[in-house]
């Protein structure tokens, strides 16, 4: 099933237009209010840990451009049902941290997994976390010890921040809107060096999602308190050795300067196959951040739709099969390669496990989550590095009042659509194809070269079941 692949570029402006045609002014909300509170915590490592995101790095971080942040927004509906939204300046939250945080929040605050939305900005200038990307870098036992200590501290900071936000809950109103900015480029269909010319000629190729979903939180007096906003584009303008939130970090800093006293929170959309192009300089990262911030600010200054104080939350952890594991002969060949290569480290580790009699996993417990805020606003989250097909397809199926976030709850691998999986099977028609649907699995350490072809169906079917529940009630 490839319904997601039928989306075309022309659909996005229609979706955005239909949003404002259907909802030109705010709806009439109940007199009862939401409750909400946000908390910000600096998570910049105190030590120069290894940085996550680029396999070519040869040393840990050596400074910072600006601080890294974790921000928490807790919302409470009229009936007392709560939702926790977490944004982090990290590459991706791994399963171990997600599971530990969920267990702690359930124990301390009786929050179920469905009520917790944990997003990573996917900055490539943040720290390596526990049990993530360990084959990519030449990590010593001392490095791993420091990474584990940082990860444990991060977990505690997150739990404490949620508790602080719960204590500070105050009456609030929630508002939804959508902006637009166009610096994201489909990296599978455009050669990076050619992008300036292609953009000038209006000839960029491939699906994109240039929408900027915005959730605004105001206090009972109408004062803006928190802005949550998303964008579907890799957070990879920079490749430096200094801590930085990249364009998403600059956007949050800009918004907090534009609106003093407001907490700005970024979430990554379905941007796994999208890049900010051109890139490679801090000036460009600041420029993209400014463009994104202004798209959010413009949205806030225009009429937005007020959301009734109703919240429904669902989640499913669905087993999705991996494709065939590499054979022992294949692993022996890989392990004999360049010892400095992460591919060699991946093959060596798997070969050692195989020789020790260990069994490789054949499927992965994959998170798909659906919230409904008010009577119509859907918010779907998908684990892994999610390609843009999912965002475009789900907005087409479920309606324009649908936000889709990738990089949520567990970033275990790339999350390709069936289209991308098929394009990435050798022989490939493009030199840009192959990574998202194939070789990236080695980066994340999984014992397979790709997901099975069922991945798109499994994710979409899970979303459909949950959308039906939140729309119709259990």
Predicted feature locations:
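Bacterial N-terminal signal peptides that target proteins for export
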Residues: 1-14, 23-25
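Serine residues within intrinsically disordered or low-complexity segments
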Residues: 18, 27-28
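N-terminal non-cleavable signal-anchor helices
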Residues: 23-26, 303-306
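Conserved beta-alpha junction segments in alpha/beta enzyme cores
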Residues: 30-119, 123-263, 267-271, 280-287, ...
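Catalytic histidine-centered segment of alpha/beta-hydrolase-like enzymes
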Residues: 274-275
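Anionic-ligand-binding alpha/beta catalytic cores of soluble enzymes and soluble regulatory domains
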Residues: 292
């Amino acid at each position: 099933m490839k319904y997601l692949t039928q989306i075309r570029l022309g659909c996005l402006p229609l979706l955005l237009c239909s949003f404002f045609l259907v909802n030109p002014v705010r709806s009439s909300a109940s007199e009862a209010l939401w409750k909400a509170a946000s908390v910000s915590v600096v998570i910049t490592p105190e030590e120069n840990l290894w940085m996550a995101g680029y396999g070519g790095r040869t040393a840990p971080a050596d400074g910072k451009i600006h601080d890294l942040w974790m921000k928490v927004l807790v919302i409470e509906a009229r009936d007392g049902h709560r939702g926790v939204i977490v944004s982090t300046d990290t590459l991706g939250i791994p399963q171990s941290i997600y599971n530990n945080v969920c267990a702690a929040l359930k124990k301390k605050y009786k929050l179920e997994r469905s009520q917790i939305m944990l997003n990573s900005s996917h900055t490539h200038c943040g720290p390596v976390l526990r049990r993530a990307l360990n084959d990519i870098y030449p990590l010593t036992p001392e490095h791993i010890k420091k990474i584990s200590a940082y990860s444990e501290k991060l977990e505690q900071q997150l739990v404490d921040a949620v508790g602080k936000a719960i204590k500070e809950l105050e009456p609030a109103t929630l508002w939804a809107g959508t902006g637009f900015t166009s610096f994201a480029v489909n990296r599978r269909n455009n050669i990076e060096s050619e992008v300036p010319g292609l953009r000038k000629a209006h000839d960029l190729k491939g699906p994109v999602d240039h929408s900027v979903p915005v959730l605004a939180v105001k206090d009972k007096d109408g004062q803006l308190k928190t802005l949550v906003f998303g964008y579907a584009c890799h957070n990879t303008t920079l490749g430096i050795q200094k801590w930085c939130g990249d364009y998403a970090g600059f956007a949050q800093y800009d918004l907090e300067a534009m609106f003093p006293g407001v907490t700005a929170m970024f979430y990554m959309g379905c941007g796994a196959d999208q890049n900010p192009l051109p890139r490679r300089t801090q000036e460009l990262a600041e420029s993209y951040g400014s463009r994104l911030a202004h798209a959010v600010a413009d949205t806030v200054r225009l009429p937005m739709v007020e959301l009734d104080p109703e919240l429904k939350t669902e989640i499913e952890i669905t087993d999705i099969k991996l494709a065939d594991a590499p054979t022992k002969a294949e692993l022996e060949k890989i392990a004999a390669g360049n010892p400095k290569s992460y591919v060699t480290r991946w093959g060596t580790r798997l070969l050692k496990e195989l020789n020790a009699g260990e069994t490789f996993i054949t499927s992965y417990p994959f998170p798909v989550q659906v919230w409904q805020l008010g009577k119509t606003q859907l918010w779907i989250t998908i684990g892994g590095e999610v390609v843009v097909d999912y965002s475009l397809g789900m907005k087409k199926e479920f309606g324009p009042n649908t936000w889709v976030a990738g990089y949520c709850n567990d970033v275990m691998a790339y999350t390709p659509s069936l289209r991308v999986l098929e394009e990435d099977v050798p022989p490939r028609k493009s030199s840009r194809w192959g990574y998202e649907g194939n070789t990236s699995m080695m980066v994340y350490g999984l014992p397979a070269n790709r997901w099975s072809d069922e991945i798109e169906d499994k994710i979409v079917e899970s979303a459909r079941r949950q959308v039906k529940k939140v729309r119709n009630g259990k």
